[in-house]
């Protein structure tokens, strides 16, 4: 992936820049926008460029389609023999990035599961479509949400509600996420991006 100025188009995402607002869209709808290493590294480069661009003020991260924000790690890619590599700054270049100076808004347009939920939790604000839902299903398959879910969720909603989600893997709809405190606003799906831009 090269700087946007070099006009090379990203393969697994898109970037639309308007008035200092970067709209970054994960584009793997056939895999529920799950991220394999090439997509993760591409997003990490996009967010590095966003950080370095003095004209960039805020980024909005969303997923293509209405079904999924991001289903997390692309397990099928791993099952098919793909190497597991993660950018130094974590999933999408966000989950292990503690030096950000500009806000990133997650516009969650559908399911945000596992690493996808962890990416949303790493953003500064979460605006969710009414039909969006969230979960950390790792415990059900003997894994742990080590890309930030285990420490960000308890900090954002308190220990007991967070453990309830982490240990059971249960899914939480957008309106419950708002009540619990990790979602900032719930809006009708068609209004999601406009609301995030405001």
Task: Tell where the protein language model's regions lie, with residue ranges.
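Crotonase-fold acyl-CoA enzyme core
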Residues: 98-198
């Amino acid at each position: 992936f090269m700087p946007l100025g070099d006009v090379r188009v990203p393969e697994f995402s898109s970037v639309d820049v308007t008035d200092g607002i970067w709209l970054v869209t994960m584009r793997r709808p056939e895999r529920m926008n799950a991220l394999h290493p090439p997509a993760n590294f591409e997003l990490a480069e996009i967010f590095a460029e966003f950080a370095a661009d003095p004209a960039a003020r805020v980024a909005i991260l969303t997923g293509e389609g209405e079904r999924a924000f991001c289903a997390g790690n692309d397990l099928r890619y791993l099952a098919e023999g793909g190497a597991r590599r993660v950018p130094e700054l974590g999933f999408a270049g966000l989950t292990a990035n503690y030096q950000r100076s500009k806000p990133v808004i997650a516009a969650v347009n559908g399911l945000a599961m596992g690493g996808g939920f962890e990416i949303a939790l790493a953003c500064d604000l979460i605006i969710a479509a009414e039909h969006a839902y969230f979960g950390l299903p790792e415990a059900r398959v003997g894994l742990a949400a080590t890309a930030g879910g285990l420490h960000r969720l308890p900090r954002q909603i308190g220990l007991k509600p967070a453990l309830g989600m982490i240990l059971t893997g249960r899914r939480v709809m957008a309106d419950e996420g708002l009540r619990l405190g990790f979602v900032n606003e719930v809006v009708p799906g068609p209004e999601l991006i406009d609301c995030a831009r405001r």
